[in-house]
Amino acid sequence: MLVRDKVGEEIQRAIDKVADSDVEVQMLTNEEFFDAIILKIRSELDVLEQTKSLDSLAEIMELVDWVQVALGTTNIQDVIQNRADKLGLYWKKYYIKEKAGK
């Protein structure tokens, strides 16, 4: 499961819990937001260091992309095109190498 899927599930679960209650949902402060993102990135880097797998690398890349889109610094179409332009051949080359090496 990719980060995007997990985040979407957690947000929907939180929305469902507060839908019928009188609760106000507030954004975290900038410091708390960045602390959470940094913690998640460190966690994913630890996994990548242990597994050295493309799936772990994809999780980190998707997390960065999701943050950029969520903050409005880029749009999803730009992210998709950027990945296709810069990583398509690279990704395919190393994916095939990893599978063949097993």
Describe the residue ranges of each PLM region.
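Flexible "arm" and connector segments at domain edges
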Residues: M1-K102
